[in-house]
Amino acid sequence: MNEAIIQLDHIDITFRQKKRVIEAVKDVTVHINQGDIYGIVGYSGAGKSTLVRVINLLQAPTNGKITVDGDVTFDQGKIQLSANALRQKRRDIGMIFQHFNLMAQKTAKENVAFALRHSSLSKTEKEHKVIELLELVGLSERADNYPAQLSGGQKQRVAIARALANDPKILISDEATSALDPKTTKQILALLQELNRKLGLTIVMITHEMQIVKDICNRVAVMQNGVLIEEGSVLDIFSNPKEALTQKFITTATGIDEALEKINQQDIVKHLPANALLAQLKYAGTSTDEPLLNSIYRQFEVTANILYGNIEILDHIPVGDMIVVLEGQAENILAAEKALHEAGVDVSILKRGA
């Protein structure tokens, strides 16, 4: 079992603004294991970016303890390392951002090399290191290009190479794909997954998009108004979200909210027969394809008209939603619901026939 490389225990972050006290982060505890791709998701103002400044050791928490790679860095607002040790610890943490922060007057390789200016490597070793990093991010042929000659995705690749220059153990991505188009976003996420596998890199994804979490993360924490409201494996959170905000994020990421809007406009739903109901079937690791739906017809004479279906593979396990119209005798539908529950399917009744 991997050990925690980042431990945040009971973190409070408070700011004083004139006579106001702003509680940006309230009693947050998060443990991130070595090799995790860990998502921290929330809307603007949730406290995500404030928490980042604590994780990357740029800000002391007001209260609580921070442990990074086995070393306590802050405890009850006080630094626990020497200035030199803290500097070295910060080098173990790379950062990429929504805005690439490249120097316009320097080429791609010069931007990467800039991160090595305090390195003990020789000039030749630095040159080799830069070449290796640009190859690692798939940009070796653009080494001599300036940022103005690069696409958004290519600029982010340079930023990733620069962030990896000092061989960090942790990479923090603060909304790093927010300015990219969907295709480029997928390419950057695929690159981050590859780096996680190749280098054993622990990655912390700060985002407001649950789609990003779904595509790349293995664990996720959901924040709201400075509070961590839900945390767990991506599989658990997607298959059984407990908090209203988490449910909202997931319905947006899976597209089921848009699907329901369209479904509710269909005649079959507007004029639902008295012996029918509209139901949402949610499942993880369970088959709700034709064999199961056929079985409730054979056993209970309940038909299932599928109006919408979505399946995601999370951690190698299928997780999905279906919207169906179940039709049959009332007692038979109840029996079919029970059979679905016993098969591991969560059944939510959205509308009953009139």
UniProtKB/Swiss-Prot annotation:
InterPro entries with a match to the protein in the record: AAA+_ATPase, ABC_transporter-like_ATP-bd, ABC_transporter-like_CS, ACT-like_dom_sf, MetN_ABC, MetN_ABC_transporter-like, NIL_domain, P-loop_NTPase
Record's bilayer topology term: Peripheral membrane protein
Pfam families documented for this protein: ABC_tran, NIL
Enzyme class: translocase
Protein family: Belongs to the ABC transporter superfamily. Methionine importer (TC 3.A.1.24) family.
Chain's role: Part of the ABC transporter complex MetNIQ involved in methionine import. Responsible for energy coupling to the transport system.
Protein name: Methionine import ATP-binding protein MetN
